[in-house]
């Protein structure tokens, strides 16, 4: 029964500062590093052995993936990085304090931007200091593929080809898969995996820790879903 382990990156410096992050490439906080290490230890304790790992091209997810693999004694496992697993792009909200954004735009409007399935936040200008246009890590992409703002619907549309081309085939081959990604890119894939409605996914939250595990049958029907927890003494 193949397993898929989702690990949202450990707490980032901007999570700690309560800032909208999106595609901004911020680092893990000290606590976030500890969370990634603990994720690896939980994976080792659970005896889960991976055949392949996937992550985004943002350092907080890459570092979480590397630490989780290191502390589960699986640092040799191949890791594939893809922009399609990046966090949702928060557009013009990127870098803003969430409380300041609410004061400026109103609590209700910010809540709609954050939690609705298909409402886009304000677009990011191409000359914004956080723009992905011109960023070397996206040099191989057509400029039209680089977003200026995303909602969860668009995030799923972006992540879905990677699921269909890479992750799902690996699981169908019976491989155990690790995905180190982000709250909203994981939520998007969970919507696909569990066939959730647009309304149902709105109530789904993915914590920075611990990792989330799915077990599948041969047709990728979910047989079990749980968060890793320390074994009781």
UniProtKB/Swiss-Prot annotation:
CDD domains, alphabetized: HP_PGM_like (cd07067)
Keyword Magnesium found: no
One Gene Ontology term of the molecular function aspect: phosphoglycerate mutase activity
Pfam families given in the database record: His_Phos_1 (PF00300)
EC number per UniProt: 5.4.2.11
Residues the record lists as binding substrate: 8-15, 21-22, 60, 87-90, 98, 114-115, 183-184
Catalysed transformations (reactions): (2R)-2-phosphoglycerate = (2R)-3-phosphoglycerate
Keyword Isomerase set for record: yes
Site residues by UniProt (Transition state stabilizer): 182
Pathway(s) the chain acts in: Carbohydrate degradation; glycolysis; pyruvate from D-glyceraldehyde 3-phosphate: step 3/5
Record-annotated active site: 9 (tele-phosphohistidine intermediate), 87 (proton donor/acceptor)
Family under the similarity heading: Belongs to the phosphoglycerate mutase family. BPG-dependent PGAM subfamily.
Listed NCBIfam families: pgm_1, PRK14115.1, PRK14117.1
Protein name, entry field: 2,3-bisphosphoglycerate-dependent phosphoglycerate mutase
Source species: Lactococcus lactis subsp. lactis (strain IL1403) (Streptococcus lactis)
Lineage: Bacteria, Bacillati, Bacillota, Bacilli, Lactobacillales
């Amino acid at each position: 029964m193949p397993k898929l382990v989702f690990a949202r990156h450990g707490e980032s410096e901007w999570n700690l500062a309560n800032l909208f992050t999106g595609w901004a490439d911020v680092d893990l906080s000290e606590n976030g590093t500890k969370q990634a290490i603990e994720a690896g230890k939980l994976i080792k304790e659970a005896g889960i052995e991976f055949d392949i790992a996937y992550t985004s091209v943002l350092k907080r997810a890459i570092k979480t993936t590397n630490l989780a693999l290191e502390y589960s004694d699986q640092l040799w496992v191949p890791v594939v990085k893809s922009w399609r697993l990046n966090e949702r792009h928060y557009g013009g909200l990127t870098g803003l304090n969430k409380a300041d954004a609410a004061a400026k735009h109103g609590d209700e409007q910010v809540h709609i931007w954050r939690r609705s399935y298909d409402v886009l936040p304000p677009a990011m200008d191409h000359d914004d200091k956080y723009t992905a246009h011109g960023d070397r890590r996206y040099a191989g992409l057509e400029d039209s593929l680089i977003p200026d703002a995303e909602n969860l619907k668009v995030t799923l549309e972006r992540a879905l080809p990677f699921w269909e081309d890479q992750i799902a085939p690996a699981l169908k081959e019976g491989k155990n898969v690790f995905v180190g990604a982000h709250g909203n890119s994981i939520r998007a894939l969970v919507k696909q995996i569990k066939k959730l409605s647009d309304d149902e996914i709105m109530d789904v939250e993915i914590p920075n820790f611990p990792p989330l595990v799915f077990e599948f049958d041969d047709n990728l029907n979910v047989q079990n879903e749980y968060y890793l927890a320390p074994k009781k003494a």
